[in-house]
From Swiss-Prot:
<keyword id="KW-0934">Plastid</keyword>
<dbReference type="GO" id="GO:0004550">
    <property type="term" value="F:nucleoside diphosphate kinase activity"/>
</dbReference>
<keyword id="KW-0418">Kinase</keyword>
<comment type="similarity">
    <text>Belongs to the NDK family.</text>
</comment>
<keyword id="KW-0809">Transit peptide</keyword>
<dbReference type="InterPro" id="IPR001564">
    <property type="entry name" value="Nucleoside_diP_kinase"/>
</dbReference>
<dbReference type="GO" id="GO:0006183">
    <property type="term" value="P:GTP biosynthetic process"/>
</dbReference>
<dbReference type="Pfam" id="PF00334">
    <property type="entry name" value="NDK"/>
</dbReference>
<feature type="binding site">
    <location>
        <position position="169"/>
    </location>
    <ligand>
        <name>ATP</name>
    </ligand>
</feature>
<keyword id="KW-0460">Magnesium</keyword>
<keyword id="KW-0808">Transferase</keyword>
<dbReference type="GO" id="GO:0006228">
    <property type="term" value="P:UTP biosynthetic process"/>
</dbReference>
<dbReference type="InterPro" id="IPR036850">
    <property type="entry name" value="NDK-like_dom_sf"/>
</dbReference>
<feature type="binding site">
    <location>
        <position position="196"/>
    </location>
    <ligand>
        <name>ATP</name>
    </ligand>
</feature>
<protein>
    <recommendedName>
        <fullName>Nucleoside diphosphate kinase 2, chloroplastic</fullName>
        <ecNumber>2.7.4.6</ecNumber>
    </recommendedName>
</protein>
<feature type="binding site">
    <location>
        <position position="186"/>
    </location>
    <ligand>
        <name>ATP</name>
    </ligand>
</feature>
<keyword id="KW-0150">Chloroplast</keyword>
Amino acid sequence: MEAMSGLSSPCNCISSLPHSSSTTTRHQNLLFRRNNHHQQKLAAFHSQSHLFSTKCPLISHSLPRKKSFKPHIFLPHLVASMEQVEETYIMIKPDGVQRGLVGEIISRFEKKGFKLIGLKMYPCPKELAEEHYKDLKAKSFYQKLIDYITSGPVVCMAWEGVGVVASSRKLIGATDPLQAEPGTIRGDLAVQTGRNVVHGSDSPDNGKREIGLWFKEGEICQWTPAQAPWLRE
């Protein structure tokens, strides 16, 4: 019975064996190194909220930075005009008219809070299209663009509002609809650059020039909407 008792308690036998001081020291050093290595590995990871943050110095430099392909809608020369009342020219192109998008596009500008001060629809004469796009005359696609704009009726609009030029560019989206963000007119309603539905002035100066080009004297209507006090302080 004593022999069986001794066999059933091997741990007691082993623990009773004498340990040399060198063995104990090596064992302690091994435990210390393992614990230190474990702490270093834990220190490399912060809370999950910072795991993929560029503010984390231990991780942000090791992760490859993904290039952003989002189009920059706001041009530098438009930033200073964001608090000024401006006018801009918006044109719904023949494809937008043929697809029945006129109401949809006008609604987006109205919901934004801009004031429609000019509106008409007519077939675009070739001479007018060439004058409008004269800065693109040297481009290889120029003639194709003129043919497209004159292929059917266009809807010409003049809009007024605070920062209307830059905001309109944002509403319209990037020239290439495939790069335009969802929620923009082109991002939602177009798929190809050559059929991108709508045109918008790219600067306050061009807004004035294009309104003067497409509208005759007396065709611009100045009025005060009832909602004006609720749009601006």
